[in-house]
């Protein structure tokens, strides 16, 4: 059986007995007060807070297997992290040599209890350490059990206080892992400390466990509020989605809007001008036309629909009475009313056109007075008639006024021949056409 004298770290560490942190299988209990727990160091090291302990599940399992489930004294290796601890190395060596022959001594360095009081967990029970409850309470328990390393001035059998009853220790077992302060070969980083901050303040593991749960209880309302906020955002998004019209709604509204606009007697330009004057959004006639033809983008259609709907409601509610919409529409109507000419008046104009396609201003005035028409109406009619003649005459076929005159079937025999001005005008138009074709 290996003894404490064979410890390779004997020169800079003290010897700990085979007592180890033992899990109790009894229901509702934590660490048993009577069982072997972390023991204090011998004389020279008692009360020295610089000594730190390295625990290894692998070493515990190996030593337990080789000694029938009991741990030897060098299962725990004590490493000093400050240089002044090496001053008591001689005293530690002497104490270790004195106890080399009795590994189960009852001295302060030896076992705190009999080996029968220690229970070592089997490998099957260790698998239970990975359950959900153990993982949830891992940081608090780990910190609580590691904090007992600061109790250097205690008695020979310092034990871990039990946590509140009602929680099964089989599922909330201790989970030992390598802290962040470890380096190669289990040596400790001097700046790091494994002492729990709660015990440094004089608090107990129970208080730390309660504080851990209180911290979680404080975090849960925050998460609940966070979920409520997301729920509110989702409800707002769904509400905005309901307000957004679909393509079918836009198509149906555009069709109804066009029918109502025509029935009310407003042009597309009137609607665009009314929107700009009433609501501050100026739209052209082309935009209104493209809306009715569903040629705008979906985004622009959605923006324009509420304005047109508002205008349509106001126009429907004020039908039959002079409103601001009618006044605005009247201002927007820059085109004059279409003039309809009777058949008899149109024949007189046609006969005069055959004699002179481009009459002078005096001839237009005289003709307007005879036919009881406005001067502007007569002038526009002659302009339109000349454009029609150009479309009807095939290119490359020169015609004289006499040819036009003879081909006119509705011209009477007493119609005077065209004047020289008309002939000169007609010849000039033919010359221009010939030059253009060349």
From Swiss-Prot:
Domain of life per record: Eukaryota
Compositionally biased residues, Low complexity: 160-172
Keyword tags: Developmental protein, DNA-binding, Homeobox, Nucleus, Transcription, Transcription regulation
Name under which the protein is recorded: POU domain, class 3, transcription factor 3-A
Family membership: Belongs to the POU transcription factor family. Class-3 subfamily.
Primary location class: nucleus
InterPro entries: HD, Homeobox_CS, Homeodomain-like_sf, Lambda_DNA-bd_dom_sf, POU, POU_dom, POU_domain_TF, TF_POU_3
Expression sites (tissue/organ): Predominantly expressed in the embryonic and adult central nervous system. In adults, isoform 2 is expressed in the brain, ovary, basal cells of the skin and muscle satellite cells.
Subcellular location field: Nucleus
Ranges annotated as biased composition (Basic residues): 210-230
POU-specific domain ranges (all copies): 242-316
One Pfam family hit: Homeodomain
CDD domains: homeodomain (cd00086)
Positions of region (Disordered): 22-43, 102-172, 186-248
GO CC term (a single one): nucleus
Lineage: Eukaryota, Metazoa, Chordata, Craniata, Vertebrata
DNA-binding region: 334-393
One GO term (biological process): regulation of transcription by RNA polymerase II
Organism (species): Danio rerio (Zebrafish)
UniProt-listed PANTHER family: POU DOMAIN, POU DOMAIN, CLASS 3, TRANSCRIPTION FACTOR 3
Function: Transcription factor that may play important roles in patterning the embryonic brain.
